[in-house]
Amino acid sequence: MVPVVALVGRPNVGKSTLFNRLTRTRDALVADFPGLTRDRKYGQARLGEEHEFIVIDTGGIDGTEEGVETKMAEQSLAAIDEADVVLFLVDGRAGLTPSDEAIAAHLRKIEKPAMLVVNKIDGIDADAACADFWQLGVDDMYQIAAAHGRGVTALLERALAPFFDDLLASESEDGEIEDLTEFEDEELAVEDYTEEDAEAEFKRLQDQPIKLAIIGRPNVGKSTLTNRILGEERVVVYDMPGTTRDSIYIPMERDGREYVLIDTAGVRRRGRINETVEKFSVVKTLKAVEDANVVLLVIDARENISDQDLSLLGFALNAGRSIVLAVNKWDGLDNEVKENVKKELDRRLGFVDFARIHFISALHGTGVGHLFESIQEAYKSATTRVGTSVLTRIMKMATDDHQPPMVRGRRIKLKYAHAGGYNPPIVVVHGNMVRDLPDSYKRYLMNYFRKSLEIMGTPIRINFQNSDNPYENRTNKLTLSQERKRKRMMSAVKNRNK
């Protein structure tokens, strides 16, 4: 399972700065669900190339009028409950405050790993700034400068070590972190996608069942659809106890293909299927998306598409998951309403025009069977092996139809392309000055690859890599005859100027 890290602390200690650095965003609007997570923001983060985790930015706790306990309950208690580890941030420049002491007292009462993080230690005597915080009775404290990334990597390695066997925190004998490497911004961190890695990923996926996550807002019909897919007799068998943030993983088979259904709503016994109130856990949904191959987003046809729907869809896209859309409760709507719903879908979901849309009734089973045709199509598109020669040929066709633009008087040259990964499919394009390609041309290439490869139901990513120039930064060494010619020319110029 993907670990969850919660950032807790009073206002202005740098929680949002650290959140933005971890999620590699600028505005912290990664998955801000209106109404449900008013005081908490959720984002995807990654340490290195393989270690993914979810980070929660909680609202600040000031501990004034109503008391810190009330504020904690309102803004951060739910986030702490959802988290696997808590990072308690304090301000090294401001020093210890009563609010910090109250928060620390609360964290000591819960059975949850909590780490004290002293932020804003850049440009000051860090040890002196941290001295007061030892009063909080902590065993260790960690010094960082979130604005510059100093100490963040080492902090994460320590925080996530219990969840990843290959992570070892870099510590000295007295427990202080020595590694102060920077957690780089996304534009500086260029991932190296190789054909060997892509082939290994392809082979791994061949032996795995398709993991299908059914997600959506509360009461759109996820439970009804899950029960319809599994069959009523399966519900009792798989009515397993789970926590508020753990989904239920249900193995199943359909059309000779093995699946693992990730149920975020929770499969209920027959007597409880008609419950009208469904608890919505954001973390549970985001974890399911991270772990899935294909995401089935359920939308209520009787309600307008909400910002929550778009946030869930955006999170699935950012995670690179294949997507199928199911518009539920379609039965009983008159034709005029149906036309209006379709127009609204076209207007608001144009950015996922590659995803199949199905109009279904989970309650009566109408259209449910066809969902799996699109699920298999999307998964096949995301995991089909494509050779280097085919990708390079498609790239050449694209450049023949529409040449890359000129940059600083030079034409950008695309040389060859190869596969860089699957689920989602990644195409790596090598060339010179490719980082100067405008976004419009990148979109053109992406759409050209999608159309040529007939990719449906999954996002496609293009990674551009500059080919190394073997003569870059090397002085041009003249031959003996060239040196003599140069001297004659210089002598002639001097004589002419006399």
Swiss-Prot record:
Binding residue positions for GTP 2: 216-223, 263-267, 328-331
GO MF term set: ATP hydrolysis activity; GTP binding; ribosome binding
Alphabetically ordered keywords of this record: GTP-binding, Nucleotide-binding, Repeat, Ribosome biogenesis
Gene Ontology biological-process entries: ribosome biogenesis
Residues covered by the KH-like domain: 384-468
InterPro entries reported in the protein's UniProt record: AAA+_ATPase, G_ENGA, GTP-bd, GTPase_Der, KH_dom-like, KH_dom-like_a/b, P-loop_NTPase, Small_GTP-bd
Cross-referenced SUPFAM superfamilies: P-loop containing nucleoside triphosphate hydrolases
Sites where the protein binds GTP 1: 9-16, 57-61, 119-122
EngA-type G domain segment(s): 3-167, 210-383
Function: GTPase that plays an essential role in the late steps of ribosome biogenesis.
NCBIfam families for this protein: GTPase_EngA (TIGR03594), small_GTP (TIGR00231)
Known partners and oligomeric status: Associates with the 50S ribosomal subunit.
Family: Belongs to the TRAFAC class TrmE-Era-EngA-EngB-Septin-like GTPase superfamily. EngA (Der) GTPase family.
Record PANTHER family: GTPASE DER
UniProt name for this protein: GTPase Der
The organism of origin for this protein: Vibrio campbellii (strain ATCC BAA-1116)
